[in-house]
Amino acid sequence: MYSVKEAFYTLQGEGVQAGRASVFCRFAGCNLWSGREQDRASAQCRFCDTDFVGTDGQNGGRFATAGALAEHITRLWPHPHEGVTPYVVFTGGEPLLQLDAALIEAVHAAGFEIGVETNGTLAAPDGIDWLCVSPKGNAPLVQTRGDELKLVHPQTDAPPERFEGLDFDHFLLQPMDTSGLMASDARKEPLSATVAHCMAHPRWRLSLQTHKIAGID
């Protein structure tokens, strides 16, 4: 059984794949925060800006088999005859709590490339085409290799230099979205700090949440 909070067609907004047409499949549940505001202060990830609780989002639901979820994802891709390889991003919450070999096989059989955005606390299964790891605080990092490491910045417990020796092709810093957590004047500080770090340490590239700028999901 796969529990999906929401699934929708959009443009990838973050990281190296920003701007790419994608079906987003957001799994319900996370291992670093319950998703309830009353638990945020004690969570390992306290800055999450995503609703991943339940299955009541757009095109959300429970799917009994990998094939059923793959069919659901396929129906959300609106351009089957354009000669472009369709792309699905599994995210959460924490997608590796649910993503398994059966679903990877079913989605590949439907013709999709598979991207995953994970907090890295669980080992990724084989068969993922693009793996983005986004470490959170002092949570133990198990997945130490992939295509991109995207670090929300600044995090007191997760300084960028801690990750520079890991086996990733791309290292990105993304300013923490504090719109719901800080007064307006303080919201500019994460962006300024991130820009300054990228300029001082060219290994790191700036990643912005372009979907929020564009006003899309």
Model-found features: residue ranges?
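Short, Lys/Arg-rich amphipathic segments at extreme N-termini
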Residues: 1-24, 194-196, 202
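Short, solvent-exposed loop/turn segments at secondary-structure boundaries
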Residues: 17, 59-60, 183-186
